[in-house]
Amino acid sequence: GSTDETWIHLLRWKEKDSRIILLNQRNAGVSAARNAGLDAARGLYVGFADPDDYMDPEMYSRLFSAALEYDADIVECGNHVFEDSSDRLIEAKRRSPSRHFEENASPASFFRDSIWGKMDICVWSKLFRKSMLDAHRLRFNVNLKSGAEDETFRLMAVPHASRLLFIPDCLYYYRLMRNGSLSRRCNVPTYSKCVQEFQRLLYIVDYWQKQGWQNEGLFAYGVRKIRPFFVSKHPLFHQMTAVQQRSALNLWKLFYQKAEGERFLSALAGRDRQLADLLNSAEPVPNGWGRILLAACSLLPGQKGRYYSCKKMLAEHFSQVCPNGFQKENASLEEPFDTSPPSL
């Protein structure tokens, strides 16, 4: 699906190595390309590399050897990060996990001590057992936009794997701050990205429920993912229109319900529990000293100030737009959005 001269270079490589199989299709995004590769793959393991990064020439052979040695369902290596402009390695961002093997991983350990809860969100540093992906019909969701497909695939695939392996070797080189890269373009927070994040979370929750995996770890993960939209140095919620704010809050309510937030609320860390409570119980702007105190607290530095700033914004929205509270059945979106999980 490339629109440049990539195909010409691939033909030259195929002339040098007959094992290379070329696939050509209309450019439909990275997920469609990966799915085409998965459908055509016939090997024991499969891997996915981003087009503007590079890797150690022995990366896949070393991952493959390690996977065979441990009979692993998924094996992951470490990675370097380098600057796009200078090729300088950024040591602070280097990821080198300790060698570890777990032969009985379980989604019940999500975000606790299990190895799979600590795995990197990206797919490019891993090999996946092909038969495992096929057995569970796992493919990338073509309805999700750039930046969401890797993490979504990981959260669908890894819980199916029971034998997980880390090797400490840094064999992948991830390009940072690349002007034309997909990851750079998707890092800018927007209302559409907020909606997309909720859509992704609802999709994952639905998938986990069907597998019988639902637990507090997934709910905590969701709260942590949406936190920057509400509580950060420059929260997107403050920049939304009133209709967009109401849409975001309605989506939160839907996620809270589907992820069984009431059941798992007590398991959240302190600030995440505060945010969940805040989003669930917004009240109108208080009168008198209460109004003054809320305004003053919103100016405090750090996390506390951001929390009160969000509380103040929610109170103002509640007073002006939704005096009767946020009700899903009365929700309206500034742009069409289907809250049902997209199909594979």
List where the protein language model places each region:
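Short, conserved active-site loop motifs that form the nucleotide-linked donor/cofactor pocket
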Residues: 19-21
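Amphipathic alpha-helical repeat scaffolds of TPR domains
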Residues: 220-232
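Membrane-interface aromatic/basic loop that binds lipid-linked glycans or pyrophosphate carriers
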Residues: 72, 235-344
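Donor-binding/catalytic cores of nucleotide-activated saccharide
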Residues: 30, 51-168, 172-191
